[in-house]
């Protein structure tokens, strides 16, 4: 009975495979939205205001960071929790594949969230005159919470590695 339960639990990790595949569909949706934004601005590129162009570029950078986050979670999560990716050496292989454990993935995700939050905060500040002060304050508080959380997670990870946990 114990062996059956352990084998069933171990096999259940494959339930995550469609979830990681679903992230690739989310990446496809993000890519469509990215190019939709570019196609939307191209006819107006000569008449668009500089501030509006910068806001659009920040949105594109934001989407790119989210896309990178999706790829990182998709591949390293799959490798850490489901199965090793079987990519032949002759093919192009990401240098970090197989080297990122759950702890480093957590830290990279936290750093990505801070970067995404920074871009969003910059976009908000570019339009600060149209945003109420209390809303600006909450954006900053939320961003600082992300920064502090990422710092604390990194610090705790450093402590646990030095103590051999």
UniProtKB/Swiss-Prot annotation:
It is found in: Cell membrane. PANTHER family: UPF0114 PROTEIN YQHA. Pfam families: UPF0114. Belongs to the UPF0114 family. It comes from the Bacteria. GO terms for cellular component: plasma membrane. This is UPF0114 protein ESA_00283. The lineage of its organism: Bacteria, Pseudomonadati, Pseudomonadota, Gammaproteobacteria, Enterobacterales. It is a multi-pass membrane protein. The chain crosses the membrane at residues 15-35, 53-73, 136-156. Keywords: Cell membrane, Membrane, Transmembrane, Transmembrane helix. InterPro entries: UPF0114, UPF0114_bac.
């Amino acid at each position: 009975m114990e062996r059956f339960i352990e084998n069933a639990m171990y096999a259940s990790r494959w339930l995550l495979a469609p979830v990681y595949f679903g992230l690739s569909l989310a990446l496809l949706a993000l890519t469509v939205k990215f190019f939709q934004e570019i196609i939307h601005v191209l006819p107006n590129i000569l008449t668009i205001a500089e501030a509006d162009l910068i806001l659009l570029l920040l949105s594109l950078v934001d989407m790119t960071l989210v896309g990178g986050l999706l790829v990182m979670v998709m591949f390293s999560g799959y490798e850490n929790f489901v199965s090793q990716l079987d990519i032949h050496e002759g093919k192009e292989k990401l240098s970090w594949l197989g080297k990122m454990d759950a702890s480093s993935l957590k830290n990279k995700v936290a750093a990505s969230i801070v970067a995404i939050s920074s871009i969003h905060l910059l976009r908000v500040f570019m339009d600060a005159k149209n945003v109420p002060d209390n809303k600006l304050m909450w954006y900053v508080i939320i961003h600082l919470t992300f920064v502090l959380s990422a710092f604390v997670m990194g610090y705790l990870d450093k402590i646990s590695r030095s103590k051999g946990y």
